Amino acid sequence: MQTSKLPVIFLLGPTASGKTDWAIAWQKKFGRIEIVSVDSVMVYKGCDIGSAKPSPETLKAHPHHLVNETSLDQIFSVADFCETATTLIEEIHQRKNIPLLVGGSMMYFNLLKNGLSSLPSADPILRAKLEDRIDKEGIVSLHDELQTLNPEAANAIKPQDTQRIIRALEVAHLSGMHPKILDEASSVPLSSIYQLLEYGIFPLDRAKLHERIESRQHRLINEGLIEEVQGLNKAYKL
């Protein structure tokens, strides 16, 4: 069926499935493709080894949007990502190119495709207070508070997932509303304005994939992962 909608390509897959290699291969073969990273860690400067970020040489030869976009001392929420990615898609089409969104952050893909609810933006002051409470009371205390304010969210978030607990409490405190109510006022989903071409890399041999993941872990450690984390912790007091 023919469509007049401009195309947007999604390339999804788990860790160590070869997404970057596929994206670069497509760019070489078809041309006029601009790669947009859909990764919650590659977006940060300095998180190079831990995120298995493409090498500087690769990024120079095959530029990736939303890689090294911001620093760890800046908040770059999923809302920021969706807004930036949507703008990038428009700009790429204006250049008569095709956006190829590549990554493994399935939540980001889902929100781009189906629309982002109009949740309140992150509040640095409130976030700092919540982080201070974690230091004093422990994360379990905040998870218990979330259980009172929004049991559904609390049940879906592990008690050790600090970032998601903080965000859920931000939403509860800033809006005074349940996220499901806020979902009614959602942004325009990409699926309604673009022709989405979705491709997935899902290895059938799970054992081999796990071997590749384990091999990557050892390689990253040998490349200096521990030292990178220590350096980031020292620089940003993580």
Please identify what each model-predicted range represents.
Residues 1-238:
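Phosphate/pyrophosphate-binding catalytic cores of soluble transferases and nucleic-acid-acting enzymes
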